[in-house]
Swiss-Prot record:
Keyword RNA-binding: yes
Gene: rplF
Keywords in alphabetical order: Ribonucleoprotein, Ribosomal protein, RNA-binding, rRNA-binding
HAMAP family assigned to the protein according to its UniProt record, in alphabetical order: Ribosomal_uL6_B
Organism: Mycoplasma pneumoniae (strain ATCC 29342 / M129 / Subtype 1)
Name this polypeptide is given: Large ribosomal subunit protein uL6
């Protein structure tokens, strides 16, 4: 039994408008619109009653159970995205590490011999504060997380000095260096 799929999704009709089509679901809110594509022959039914969305399965096959939880989570994330939005914060730790935004490009200097230029995807806003704090925000949870991961991959945090691109609340478990074990 899918626990996530059985959750009802509560809607605020003043803020969110759902439109169900044969091949997609459109979620419209104050921050924008998200369209979720639906696979053909989806074994789910969507019922909207009294500002609550209930998703039910047509059968008990394994594939139906998988879709049940997945689409419940995707619709919930779309509703949160168009009403509140999503945000990820990154911080740059290291000597000379800095970032700035020029138009649609995020420029990073992470200790390489050349600057790194990351194109900012449509639908995202990137702000840089104090040259070392990057805030990525948008209505799509997937897109925000994916871009944050792309930026982070350029210089993953290392455990000896703690340098790199870190999520704002991330804690790096530090390792002792070679000299910490004792000299012979």
């Amino acid at each position: 039994m899918s626990k996530i799929g059985n959750r009802t999704i509560t809607l605020d009709p003043a803020k969110v408008n759902l439109n169900f089509q044969k091949d997609h679901i459109a979620v419209k809110g104050p921050l924008g619109q998200i369209e979720l594509k639906l696979p053909p022959n989806l074994p789910l039914k969507f019922e909207l009653k009294d500002n609550n969305l209930q998703i039910t399965r047509n059968n008990e096959l394994k594939q139906s159970k998988i879709f049940h939880g997945t689409y419940n989570a995707l619709i919930t994330n779309a509703i949160i995205g168009v009403t509140q939005g999503f945000e990820k914060k990154l911080r740059l730790v290291g000597v000379g590490y800095r970032a700035n935004v020029e138009g649609e490009t995020l420029n990073l200097q992470l200790g390489y011999s050349h600057p790194i230029k990351e194109k900012i995807p449509k639908g995202l806003t990137v702000k840089v504060e104090k040259n070392t704090e990057i805030t990525i925000s948008g209505i799509s949870k997937e897109l925000v997380g994916q871009f944050a991961t792309e930026v982070r991959k350029w210089r993953k945090p290392e455990p000896y000095k703690g340098k790199g691109v870190l999520y704002f609340d991330e804690v790096i478990v530090r390792k002792a260096g070679k000299t910490a074990e004792g000299k012979k």
